[in-house]
């Protein structure tokens, strides 16, 4: 049976530790979202007379509901997109002064249609349909 001296042992230990560290470093560099994902099969209705939804009674107002941000744009139309930034999963906010969505985590900017205006977000926000009937706003996939 062959024995290992101290120098050889420490050398192999160092190589093994370096390989393990590199695996973790490069594993963390893989593209993709580490945060929550956009909701699928969305279908809900908001009663605009309910005080919980009062933010949508004013142009520039917005609210979050089940992973979706619903906003009433500065021109009075309703838009709905996933509330989670596609870069790191931060919660986006509606910016009425520039009529877009903004992620405060790393600065990504999205149009009201969800497309990326300014990264680092790699892909658009999922956009949902909206339909207003009287005082009921339906948001759906």
Q: How does the language model describe each region?
A:
Residues 1-20, 24-35:
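N-terminal secretory signal peptides and thylakoid transit peptides that target proteins
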Residues 15, 90, 108:
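Flexible cofactor-recognition loop at the NAD(P)H-binding site
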Residues 31-97, 126-141:
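N-terminal pre-ligand scaffold of iron-sulfur
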Residues 94-95, 108-115:
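Iron-sulfur (Fe-S) cluster-binding segments and ferredoxin-like electron-carrier domains
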Residues 99-106, 117-125:
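Short cysteine/histidine-rich metal-coordination sites, predominantly Zn2+-binding motifs
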